[in-house]
């Protein structure tokens, strides 16, 4: 019997510092696409990723689609 594919979903991660302040060299918001397992991580995912607009590693938070 095959397992259900509904557990693993695609999510979008957005930079928290880019969306809050406008004092950057370039305008834009850094976004990453990833997958998460709903059973293991029911809450919103937060990862530290590189932001090309801030030129630093910043916290990227899961957003609603």
Swiss-Prot record:
GO terms for cellular component: chloroplast; ribonucleoprotein complex; ribosome. GO terms for biological process: translation. It is found in: Plastid, Chloroplast. Its main location: plastid. Keywords: Chloroplast, Plastid, Ribonucleoprotein, Ribosomal protein. Transmembrane segments: none annotated. GO terms for molecular function: structural constituent of ribosome. The keyword Heme does not apply. Signal peptide: none annotated. It comes from the Eukaryota. NCBIfam families: PRK00504.1, PRK00595.1, rpmG_bact. PANTHER family: 50S RIBOSOMAL PROTEIN L33, CHLOROPLASTIC, LARGE RIBOSOMAL SUBUNIT PROTEIN BL33C. Belongs to the bacterial ribosomal protein bL33 family. This is Large ribosomal subunit protein bL33c. The lineage of its organism: Eukaryota, Viridiplantae, Streptophyta, Embryophyta, Anthocerotophyta.
């Amino acid at each position: 019997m095959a397992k259900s594919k509904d557990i693993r979903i695609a999510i979008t991660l957005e930079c928290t510092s880019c969306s809050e302040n406008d004092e950057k060299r370039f305008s834009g918001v850094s976004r990453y696409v990833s997958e998460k397992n709903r059973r293991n991580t029911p809450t919103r995912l937060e990862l530290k990723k590189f932001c090309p607009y801030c030129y630093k590693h910043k916290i990227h938070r899961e957003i609603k689609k």
